[in-house]
């Protein structure tokens, strides 16, 4: 069985208050002066104080083996802040730290360890506040208003480095080779790790490590680093430093899922919903010039315009990519929304998904068998449902304690206002008719004979994504649906959590004393007119799922208050994020892919044309992480996702999977 929970660190604190691993019988940092040792070994060993002012790029990337208590990261963050204060006009503006940890500390142990260094408290408190759940894979933390990016990879570093996407190759400017001593933890210090470090190292990259062990020096030399010894810290005689002085050949392991970015830093986004808004912020943070073209007279008039939407992950025992993506997307979304400096109605009240019939009960039982962290999802018996939700249902289920609801329309509008303050240009009532490649950019033709030219274009226009020649073959479909707005009653007012069944019901929004109930589902439809039949169906599904609940029968839809929208979806329930694939070229280039994988060229795509679509009914959960993934890809920065899960988001995936099996592919 695949487990989706990571074992926490098994540690104790010694007489000096230093954390000690029980499993490895080694300290996390020196009893004497761990802070000064970090500054000497890792910051000094990589010459960071001298390199920061001369760095020719806006981003500096550091990778580390063994996050532990985060001492190395916090010390580096402090030094980077001091550099930025002393050199405000320097080219280098942002720091990206990538670290691997097999046994992450609990938040409580982390906070206890941080008491050792009061001078690091301002940085440590931010880290503790965002400390992720013990889930495998990459957890991206945006710190210091996005100037600091921390990618925490939970799992075995030798396994994780083999699962990294090729976009991480040659991105690292400095390596901190840390961890428990080689004699205590020999499984980490392998040639496989040294080779991975070399693969990820940018030409000119450096490394430093506290050990001077001969097999470590020889292994790093074999991987491609030029190594030398340096005086060790304190009583340690020697340590090792290295430089990547060569450019290593880097074969692409899965060229059919290759992702390309752009160095142009200027883009147009087509859309006006949550995807467009969050991507705008992510690109602006990276220094892009961004222009948004919205077909409507105001933002959030499409699928992002609902009053209340539920936030919780989509899980399935039989789909590892879906589980990995949505569990990490959900936790990222919560961190992101909590730090977002804009106002929007929301309540992290929890979400309870109920087993209202045999099929749904079986599905929930399968989800609960996946060894999920209790902070993410936990079983709830029928007799406890009323206590935690406030209403009687006579059903058991699964509760997502960190879930809840938010107002997508208000979120989208206010995020766009924030983006405008940061430089976003917005044009409303610009309906894109077609686009074509022109010189080194894209010519956009809008209704009313309006034109514009941009270096890079992102299509984030929901169900209208496939209306252009470049996207007409995409395997996406429209889903029309109606959400009913119902007045509260004394019984409904007791509802404390979002209920999910064969539909969903939100607690009341105290701003309007209404609940949302929905949604109807019409695959292939783009109808947005009010439907009395849908209104009645939304009510009836609630009654059918909870036939003994009197409060359900009292739901009143007679006011005919509702909102109709159209979503864009895929049959595998995952978003499509990345380069727009060239359908015709894909069929030609990959006609013999099943027999000639070794000869495959890089995925045929349209240069400088990207897409952010098919968020389906889980856009509030997936959009923040997808925006971060796409902005990182476009900016040629490290992407916070393992290769196989990232491939499951590739817009060409459904075609390529068939071609890899030698099956025929049809458009749409």
From Swiss-Prot:
GO terms for molecular function: flavin adenine dinucleotide binding; oxidoreductase activity, acting on the CH-NH group of donors; tRNA (5-methylaminomethyl-2-thiouridylate)(34)-methyltransferase activity. GO terms for cellular component: cytoplasm. Keywords: Cytoplasm, FAD, Flavoprotein, Methyltransferase, Multifunctional enzyme, Oxidoreductase, S-adenosyl-L-methionine, Transferase, tRNA processing. GO terms for biological process: methylation; tRNA wobble uridine modification. The keyword Cell membrane does not apply. Residues 270-668 are annotated as: FAD-dependent cmnm(5)s(2)U34 oxidoreductase. Signal peptide: none annotated. Its cofactor is FAD. It comes from the Bacteria. Pfam families: DAO, Methyltransf_30. Residues 1-245 are annotated as: tRNA (mnm(5)s(2)U34)-methyltransferase. Its EC number is 2.1.1.61, 1.5.-.-. It is found in: Cytoplasm. In the N-terminal section; belongs to the methyltransferase superfamily. tRNA (mnm(5)s(2)U34)-methyltransferase family. PANTHER family: SARCOSINE DEHYDROGENASE-RELATED (PTHR13847), TRNA 5-METHYLAMINOMETHYL-2-THIOURIDINE BIOSYNTHESIS BIFUNCTIONAL PROTEIN MNMC (PTHR13847:SF283). Catalyzes the last two steps in the biosynthesis of 5-methylaminomethyl-2-thiouridine (mnm(5)s(2)U) at the wobble position (U34) in tRNA. Catalyzes the FAD-dependent demodification of cmnm(5)s(2)U34 to nm(5)s(2)U34, followed by the transfer of a methyl group from S-adenosyl-L-methionine to nm(5)s(2)U34, to form mnm(5)s(2)U34. This is tRNA 5-methylaminomethyl-2-thiouridine biosynthesis bifunctional protein MnmC.
């Amino acid at each position: 069985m695949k487990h989706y929970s990571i074992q926490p660190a098994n540690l104790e604190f010694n007489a000096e208050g230093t954390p000690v691993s029980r499993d490895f019988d080694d300290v996390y940092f020196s009893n004497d002066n761990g802070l000064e040792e970090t500054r000497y070994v890792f910051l000094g060993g990589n010459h960071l104080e001298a390199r920061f002012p001369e760095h020719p790029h806006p981003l500096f990337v550091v990778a580390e083996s063994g996050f532990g208590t985060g001492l190395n990261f916090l010390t580096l963050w402090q030094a980077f802040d001091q550099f930025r204060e002393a050199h405000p006009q320097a080219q280098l503006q942002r720091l990206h730290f990538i670290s691997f940890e097999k046994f992450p500390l609990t938040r409580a142990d982390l906070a206890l360890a941080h008491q050792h260094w009061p001078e690091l408290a301002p940085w440590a408190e931010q880290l503790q506040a965002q400390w992720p759940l013990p889930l495998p894979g990459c957890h991206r933390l945006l710190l210091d208003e996005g100037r600091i990016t921390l990618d925490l990879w939970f799992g075995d570093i030798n396994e994780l480095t083999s699962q990294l996407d090729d976009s991480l190759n040659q991105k690292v400017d400095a390596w901190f080779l840390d961890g428990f001593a080689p004699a205590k933890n020999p499984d980490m210090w392998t040639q496989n790790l040294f080779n991975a470090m070399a693969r990820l190292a940018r030409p000119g990259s450096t490394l430093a490590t506290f050990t001077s062990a001969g097999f470590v020096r020889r292994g790093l030399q074999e991987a491609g680093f030029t190594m030398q010894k340096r005086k060790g810290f304190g009583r340690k005689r020697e340590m090792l430093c290295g430089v990547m002085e060569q450019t290593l050949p880097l074969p692409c392991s899965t060229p059919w899922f290759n992702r390309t970015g752009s160095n142009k830093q200027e883009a147009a986004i087509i859309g006006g919903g949550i995807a467009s808004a969050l991507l705008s912020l992510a690109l602006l943070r990276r220094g892009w010039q961004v222009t948004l073209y919205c077909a409507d007279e105001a933002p959030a008039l499409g699928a992002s315009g609902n009053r209340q939407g539920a936030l919780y992950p989509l899980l399935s025992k039989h789909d590892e990519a879906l589980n990995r993506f949505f569990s990490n997307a959900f936790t990222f979304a919560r961190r992101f929304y909590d730090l977002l400096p804009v106002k929007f109605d929301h309540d992290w009240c929890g979400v309870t998904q109920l087993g209202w019939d045999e099929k749904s009960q079986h599905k929930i039982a399968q989800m609960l068998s996946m060894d999920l962290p209790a902070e993410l999802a936990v079983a709830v018996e029928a007799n406890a449902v009323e206590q935690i939700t406030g209403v009687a249902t006579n059903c058991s289920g699964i509760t997502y304690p960190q879930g809840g609801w938010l107002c997508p329309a208000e979120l989208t509008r206010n995020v766009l206002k924030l983006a405008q303050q940061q430089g976003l240009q917005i044009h409303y009532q610009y309906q894109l008719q077609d686009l074509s490649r022109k010189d080194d950019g894209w010519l956009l033709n809008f209704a009313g004979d309006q034109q514009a030219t941009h270096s890079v274009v992102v299509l984030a226009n929901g169900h209208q994504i496939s209306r252009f020649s470049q996207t007409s073959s995409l395997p996406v479909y429209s889903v029309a649906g109606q959400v009913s707005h119902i007045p509260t009653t004394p019984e409904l007012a007791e509802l404390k959590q979002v209920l999910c069944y064969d539909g969903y019901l939100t607690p009341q929004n105290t701003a309007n004393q209404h609940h949302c109930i929905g949604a109807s589902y019409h695959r292939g439809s783009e109808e947005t007119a009010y439907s009395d039949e849908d209104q009645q169906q939304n009510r009836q599904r609630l009654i059918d799922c909870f036939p003994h609940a009197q409060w359900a029968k009292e739901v009143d839809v007679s006011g005919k208050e509702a909102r109709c929208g159209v979503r864009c979806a895929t049959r595998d329930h995952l978003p499509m994020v990345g380069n727009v694939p060239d359908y015709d070229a894909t069929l030609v280039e990959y006609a013999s892919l099943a027999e000639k994988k070794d000869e495959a060229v890089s995925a045929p795509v349209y240069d400088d044309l990207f897409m952010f679509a098919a968020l389906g009914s889980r856009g509030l959960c997936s959009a923040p992480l997808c925006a971060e993934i796409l902005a990182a890809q476009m900016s040629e920065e490290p992407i916070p996702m393992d290769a196989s899960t990232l491939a499951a988001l590739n817009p060409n995936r459904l075609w390529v999977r068939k071609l890899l099996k030698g099956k025929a592919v049809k458009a749409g």
